[in-house]
């Protein structure tokens, strides 16, 4: 099974970079996240994010997110619902409002100092239709992520690597697998409730017209109550 997964990932990687006329972009992300327990298996979350692209020269996106989640199976499984407001710079050169709803299921297993997470997420993006330029509304994605985390014993440091596939489900002309995201992160626990995370992220367009490879550097302040 591991060999099969490795072969699939290698084939996908070769296919991604074999596409002609790929362009490259660099950007940055600054965000803050907070989690709070509601007692028992229930919890709340919130996130604020600012993202820059075009070689750090353009403000690309402002995101506000709130969510509620439920843990079960001795905290191995987490089911969450999120609602997002996004203010994003689009391809036509102006900022538009977007709304997003997401439903996700995350399963976690631990082995010694390693943590393995598999997340499956259904996400719908709702566009502002006053301009009439969106052919598909809402746009529905199915996202699947594998994340491996390592934390040395008695250490404030934590290291993680994840890969995520984006599958567009409701566009008859462009539907299918269209993005691969890879994230490498390092977390440092500042205090009992606060953690600072630095990360590098790579987003690769797959099998689309005018594919772009986007590279981001980011910082996230995390709080847990």
Residue ranges and their predicted role:
Residues 41-46, 75-79, 112-116, 154-158, ...:
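Repeated loop/turn-to-beta-strand initiation elements of outer-membrane beta-barrel proteins
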Residues 36, 70-72, 107-109, 150-152, ...:
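Residue-level signature of outer-membrane beta-barrel architecture
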Residues 9-17:
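Hydrophobic h-region of N-terminal signal peptides that target proteins for export
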Residues 46-48, 79-83, 105, 118-120, ...:
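Membrane-embedded beta-strand positions of outer-membrane beta-barrel proteins
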């Amino acid at each position: 099974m591991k060999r099969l997964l490795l072969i699939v990932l290698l084939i996908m990687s070769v296919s991604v970079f074999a596409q002609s006329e790929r362009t490259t972009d660099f950007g940055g992300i600054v965000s803050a996240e907070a989690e709070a327990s509601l007692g028992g298996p229930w919890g709340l979350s919130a996130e604020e994010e600012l993202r820059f692209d075009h070689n750090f020269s353009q403000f690309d996106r402002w995101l506000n997110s709130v969510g509620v989640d439920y843990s079960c199976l001795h905290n191995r499984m987490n089911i969450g619902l999120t609602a997002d407001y996004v203010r994003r710079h689009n391809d036509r050169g102006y900022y538009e409002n977007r709304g997003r709803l997401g439903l996700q299921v995350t399963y976690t297993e631990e082995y010694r100092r390693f943590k393995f997470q598999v997340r499956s997420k259904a996400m719908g993006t709702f566009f502002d239709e006053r301009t009439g330029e969106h052919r598909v509304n809402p746009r529905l994605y199915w996202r699947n992520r594998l994340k491996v985390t390592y934390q040395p014993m008695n250490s404030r440091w934590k290291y993680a690597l994840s890969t995520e596939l984006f599958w567009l489900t409701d566009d008859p002309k462009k539907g299918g697998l269209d993005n691969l995201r890879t994230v490498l992160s390092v977390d440092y626990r500042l205090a009992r409730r606060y953690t600072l995370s630095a990360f590098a992220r790579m987003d690769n367009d797959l099998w689309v017209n005018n594919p772009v490879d986007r590279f981001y550097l980011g910082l996230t302040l995390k709080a847990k109550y």
